[in-house]
Amino acid sequence: MAKYGLYKTFPDLWLQECPAEWEAVKIKYLFSERSEKGYPNEPLLVSSQNIGVVPKEVFGNRTVEASKDLHLLKLVQIGDFVISLRSFQGGLEYAYYRGIISPAYTILVPGEKIDGGYFRYLAKSVRFIELLQMCVTGIREGQNIDYMKLKNHLIPVPSLEEQKKIAQYLDWQVSKINRLIEAKKKEIVRLTELKKTVVNEAVTHGLNPNVPMKFSGVEWLGNIPAHWTTIKLRQILHPFSEKNHPELPLLSVVREQGVIIRNVEDKESNHNFIPDDLSGYKMVKKGQFAMNKMKAWQGSYGISNYTGIVSPAYFIFDVDFENLEYFHYAIRSKVYVNFFAQASDGIRVGQWDLSINKMKEIPFIVPPEDEQNAIVEYIPVAFAKYDEAITTLTEEVDILHELRNKLISDVVTGQIDVRDIEVPDFEYVEETEDESDDDSDEDGVTVDEEV
């Protein structure tokens, strides 16, 4: 693609060079800071690295409950930019809505010399994020961007007309890439659902389609093999609670994977608060069953392959069942997710508190031991073809993300000249936010409920 005719360097600019006709201006001369409070009736906003600053209900249920002191939150207007606690990892966030947000965030209002559309892309470019990382203060969980440092840095500033053209061009090109990404992500979702169907069919009907069937006793479950038995979960799961093991690794219980080791160094996936004192966290031993009781209705539970500690709000059980691998597959199937949903009571959006008494009465279907073993051997083989396709699609999505990021970075830093490119009419396509599969220890749960 075409480059500009002449380039120049600025001594204090973080870019090697930019087009000769562009300016380099300090951020503090392009933006003013908004710090208005006292708007408790405005909608609550959250800052997402993928979809910008949006209402809490748009983002979902992945954030901690807001403070009651809503009058202390900062006002955000449409078109503002927000420096959040994780902006040093993913850039500044553009506000698509008016509302209120954490007072810990810095709100920037674009001035007359900067176009919001242009800066929205510049603020997400790889090179700008590198600049943000130079302005970080604090360590680990306490890291944040020091705006007093950031505002004195230069950024490249084309003419206002050219900024608008760059934003228009990138909207067009990014939409084309996002359309491809969305198609691949949709196929990944379809294949993932097919994998769930494989498990669901195996643990409710077995592998032999010709065996006699009987009514399960549950209307929406239908028939099960006549020679299978049904017991209650209270016969299998026995409550366990042990604390004071802060030296053990921190674990998470997530919907798609069950119990995993939590990466405490990854600030992006650890937006939930991790206390300094972990002595109150519950121990989970390898082979035990751990459950996020607020997210059981989504499937956030499973047999642990690790010994570690989890949120004190979780349920932990010893498991009286010989084939733990079969139990793990079965209990995480769609059938049992539905049972747990029925045994939970909604307390707020996205959070349903599981009743331990109702849970104990959930039926569990038990095939003979040889059939359990056969099902455990069958499922990974059946998964293989889906997993291969999902891996390929995921790699293709990653490549498209890299292509999109490079294009944005090249255009907003003047490595590509788009001034003479005619942009046709197009439909803008945003990449949708992936559903969260994170551990939600802090989703308003502060009571240590023992079972």
Predicted regions and their residues:
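Sequence-specific dsDNA recognition surfaces
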Residues: T9-D12, V25-I78, R234-K286, T432, ...
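Non-catalytic DNA-recognition/assembly elements of restriction-modification systems
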Residues: Y4-Y39, L160, K164, F215-P246, ...
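Short, ligand-facing micro-motifs at secondary-structure edges
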Residues: P40-R62, F81-T106, G117-Y121, E130-C135, ...
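A short glycine-rich beta-alpha junction/loop motif
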Residues: Y7-F10, L85-R86, G99-T106, I139-K164, ...
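Amphipathic alpha-helical coiled-coil/heptad-repeat segments
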Residues: M1-E17, E21, P158-V211, V366-V451
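Ligand-binding loop in jelly-roll beta-barrel domains
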Residues: P110-D115, V319-N323
